[in-house]
From Swiss-Prot:
Residues 4-123 form the PINc domain. Its EC number is 3.1.-.-. This is Ribonuclease VapC1. The keyword Hydrolase applies.
């Protein structure tokens, strides 16, 4: 059994609001390269150099903690299906979320997120969540 970790969980992990222990019972945890992209976009938006260095160090930690799954041709086909399914239902979801979902569906893994509302609308995706310390 495997689990894809969404960006919302990674950000909560960085902020100390969740712990890897909360999902360790699901087995191997992975991230999509899109999650890494979102994290790097966030780093590029940081103006404070010290904070930027901390963010980059955290990204290196994330890369060591999780296997980054590939995004290849199978994921592309799944992504296209997701777009078409949502279009037929007149549902709009962020591009990155659909790409992350495509990675999870293609590999047959559940998705762990704090953004349940959007991901629940994607057919064929098992969505899981954990409680976050606020």
């Amino acid at each position: 059994m495997g689990l894809i970790i969404d960006t919302s969980i990674i950000i909560a992990l960085e902020r100390g609001k969740v712990s890897t222990k909360q999902w360790s019972h699901y087995g191997q945890a992975y991230i999509s390269p899109i999650v890494l992209t979102e994290l790097l976009i966030g780093v590029d938006r940081v103006n404070n150099e010290n904070k930027r260095i901390k963010c980059l160090a955290f990204i290196e930690y994330v890369k060591s903690l999780f296997t980054i799954l590939p995004f290849g041709i199978e994921e592309v086909y799944t992504y296209a299906r997701i777009i078409n399914d949502l279009y037929k239902q007149r549902i709009t979801i962020g591009t990155h979320d659909m790409l992350i979902a495509a990675t999870a569906i293609t590999h047959g893994y559940s998705l762990l997120t704090l953004n349940v509302k959007d991901f629940k609308r994607i057919q064929g995706l098992e969505v899981l969540t954990v409680s976050s310390k606020d």
